[in-house]
Amino acid sequence: MLETRGLVKVYPGPVTALNGIDLDVHPGMFGLLGPNGAGKTTFMKILAGLLEPTSGTVRLDGADILEHPESLWPRLGYLPQEFGFYPHLSGEAMLVHLLELKGVEAPGGLKKLAGDLLERVNLTFAAKRQVKGYSGGMRQRLGIAQALAGDPRLIIVDEPTAGLDPEERLRFYRLLSELAANRIVLLSTHIVEDVAVLCPRFAIIREGRLLALTSPSEARASIAGHMYEGTVPVEDLPKLRAERMVTQALLVEGRNRARIYDPSGAPPEGFVQVPVTLEDAYLVLMRLGTLPSRGKRAPMGSSGEDAPGAPAVGPFAAASVAPAR
């Protein structure tokens, strides 16, 4: 289990990037969702040993990785936003180099192990090609192979799908879902669909604070029955925004098609109730600062499983990951 307690990071200025993060993450896929500048990358860099916190503790399976960072390196896989590749090396040579740095030993040799990693991410055909000749999707897959080097206990994946086209994203989801067996995979993203497809549990972060710890089904249930959609003239949109929580508004043929959150049960004339999406719940939470209470929810700091039988959501539902058992 990964545990953080009272994690704070203050940059010169002062700028508080993290403000008391308490979180327990169990084996399986766990998401950290929030807007740009929320503190996600700072959090990930601290976990990866690339940044020292101002205060707080981080433990992996009971061991304090801030006190003994050397104990983390062999057990860590890290897929950062910006890949750390040597462009002149081949994909195979890049992996061999990383395996050597990690002190990995393999009966068949490191080249064979590197080949096995490339095969796992469908890059065997490009094993001898220089990394500078890889496409964006190929670089993403090589990054996964790097993260898997040494069979790590903890894999940190920071903003993995930014810039990927839909086909590459679906392929990436499938690859990432395979990593979650018997290890902790921590995914940070600002894309709601990423957590909807991959994460049985996730936390929502804003301005360095955790606003909620939830699951896709819990988040949707928190606003169920309170989302409405309708059209309004362009000139009436400011009045609607003043009176209701408008989460989305799209201009269509001279009128605004608006989506609103209205717990009063008395929506404006012409608005009809619509099914709730995870994006709806996320947008409402970002406005309210908390999820509306709809019964018992898991306490902050716990990252257990989603409710049994929770429906898959999003256009990539076929790639959804079952909670780790």
Predicted regions and their residues:
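ABC transporter nucleotide-binding domains
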Residues: L2-T4, K9-R206, A212
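C-terminal coupling/interaction segments
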Residues: Q248, V252-R325
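A structural signal for well-ordered alpha-helical scaffolds and beta->alpha junctions
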Residues: K111, P233, P275-E279
